[in-house]
Amino acid sequence: MRTSQYLLATQKETPADAVVISHQLMLRAGMIRKLASGLYTWLPMGLRVMRKVEAVVREEMNAAGALEVLMPSIQPAELWQESGRWEQYGPELLRLKDRHQRDFCVGPTHEEVITDLARNELSSYKQLPLNLYQIQTKFRDEIRPRFGLMRGREFIMKDAYSFHADQASLQETYDRMHQAYSNVFTRLGLDFRPVQADTGSIGGSYSHEFHVLAESGEDDVIFSDSSDYAANIEKAEAIPRETVRPAPTEELRLVDTPNAKTIAQLVENHGLPIEKTVKTLIVRGAEEGKLIALIVRGDHELNEIKATKLEQVADPLVMATEAELRDAIGAGAGSLGPLNLPLEIIIDRSVALMSDFGIGANIDDKHYFGVNWERDLPVPQVADLRNVVEGDPSPDGQGTLVIKRGIEVGHIFQLGTKYSEALKCQVLGENGKPVVLSMGCYGIGVSRVVAAAIEQSYDDKGIIWNDALAPFQIALVPLRYETDVVREATDKLYAELTAAGYEVLLDDRDKKTSPGIKFADMELIGIPHRIVVSDRGLAEGNLEYKHRTEQDAQALPLNEVLTFLQARVRR
């Protein structure tokens, strides 16, 4: 491809509304253009990258035994009402009416549509398992679209759905898709982690997220430094570093603390180490009118997902109001503790191993110091209540936990029978009786992968693509292309490279465009291999080669170009 025949839409300045680096660089490199809030047009340069992602995804889905379909993006309300999600989904679901005043939505996901297809097409266990996928435009009406393609309203997604007669079959396909996802992100050259995850609003019983590691990521990714253990922050099990509770060394004492409404103030004003403090959080219980006390160490954070999985706690988690605290305990939020507390108490594992610690006295402006379990109060129910912190022991017993930021690019679920039961999707089983199908759901954010790859690999000059993702593999930049000797050598080399199967962008802009601008544009776009053709180099029988990640260029004999590139360019 020649730049004279291409839409080369690079920009020197960074748009003011672009915050994250992927958004900035995709605009500046001429990959996308904003149409409206959360809506983007893909220009040729960006579309080439996304098509490469799609190609790898298709190959791995096909290899895993999935069959490609294409479902409508507009979905009838009746299906969503049948599943119960028409009202549950909330304002992110873009609802509309046709000219006959019938209700539809723009699909944010396709569980209902695929389940409707399956219940109409499948009748026997002999047709199972069945795994169907599509690459389709989705729409979620985000309240505040931001970060370009990282959190837009319209996006491209690969979603697959599998149907099974039993759990064993679902597990087999789930494992195969897990491997297929790992294959996809490995082939795309990304540094990623598959992590155990909570199933969230999609539902189901078991799931994994796939995260590209990047400092700009919105999620915490937890993994062991010595094993394959990995989980997201909601799912990661918190194991105490301590194994034994120390013996008491202090006497219990009641202390006036008028200036200690928070843990930070308690530490600062009374010299108590933060790891010797606790937070007593009062939440509403699952039983109407009941309050539950959840206690974590002062330097730890309550994990709301873990808390709501306790049978005593209401879901979603709701903190007690100040009025409720006064009515039930007689003290405000800054002075609460487990001693003489007239509520059911659940403490975190780390709290159960504390000694000589400080707690609120359930009297305004007073705390107990030197508190010890079993001596001063009984050990209540113990549970995993907190977020893990870096350095915690790995739950599998191997190594310690590391925390990195990650961008979620894939998510796989074992849905079970949630949708098949709601939509009555069943077949005749081997015994001739109806069997409600078990389902799996598997998503990859195709357009998000492009942005995530940039967040992981860039410098002050622009994007750094690897060979698998680059819009072009080679940038061919002639100096003084208007001269016969340079033009003839460049055109000959361009023909040889394209005939050999390389994707080449020939920068044939005229002499009004300086070499510096050409080099800067190719680096901004992120093309991994650059070859410069100059009359001086040709006189010596050489070209100039430079990799995008290298500082210095090197002389490359003209007659060794193809051999050299064969060893350097991943194809």
From Swiss-Prot:
GO terms for biological process: prolyl-tRNA aminoacylation. It is found in: Cytoplasm. GO terms for molecular function: aminoacyl-tRNA deacylase activity; ATP binding; proline-tRNA ligase activity. It is an enzyme of class 6 (ligase). Its EC number is 6.1.1.15. Keywords: Aminoacyl-tRNA synthetase, ATP-binding, Cytoplasm, Ligase, Nucleotide-binding, Protein biosynthesis. Catalyzes the attachment of proline to tRNA(Pro) in a two-step reaction: proline is first activated by ATP to form Pro-AMP and then transferred to the acceptor end of tRNA(Pro). As ProRS can inadvertently accommodate and process non-cognate amino acids such as alanine and cysteine, to avoid such errors it has two additional distinct editing activities against alanine. One activity is designated as 'pretransfer' editing and involves the tRNA(Pro)-independent hydrolysis of activated Ala-AMP. Homodimer. This is Proline--tRNA ligase.
